[in-house]
Amino acid sequence: MILGIDVSEHNGMIDWKYLKEWGVGFAILRLGYGKGHLDGRFYEYINGALGVGIPAGVYYYSYALQEKEARAEAWFSAYVLQDCGVTPERLPLGVWYDMEDADGWKSSHGMPDNEEITAMCGAYTKEMARYGYPCGVYASYDWLMHRIDRKQLSPYMSYWCAQWGSTCDFPGAAIWQYTDHLEIGGKVYDGHW
């Protein structure tokens, strides 16, 4: 298995060369969140990871409550990737649509039902595919099993499952987030296999 991390501006300055030497084999970087909010360190991170040869992917933390908002999040994602010159070929881990409610925003603004959550995942991933970017869905094990109707999405959809512990119970997870506390050089990251 290959060790990976995901990062956002909350991780601060990152020594990408050190991470590569330590054995990090891939990184998934937060591109942005919500209605057109760019992660404050995205350009720095994408250039840093690719600059030292760490294979990368990106994720977009969704605040969408309906399909049209999910499509707008995809348009913004594609715009940013094109703006920084990151073609699909330079992004081997693709694009991931982060569907969760970790900060309670969806709950406090009218949590969509499962049908709408599934439709938003489909809308974002289809829109990114139109731009040529392979795209999958990130969610917790619970959301993948109980909130997202995977039968309504493409049979070729990839899933990145967050389930902390020693095993991943989600069948066929492309990436498994096994911890939110992977310490490398005194800094803490989310860890993945």
Language-model segments: residues:
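Functionally critical loop-and-helix segments that line ligand-binding/catalytic clefts
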Residues: 1-11, 17-21, 150-193
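Aromatic-lined carbohydrate-recognition surfaces of secreted/lumenal glycan-active proteins
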Residues: 128-146
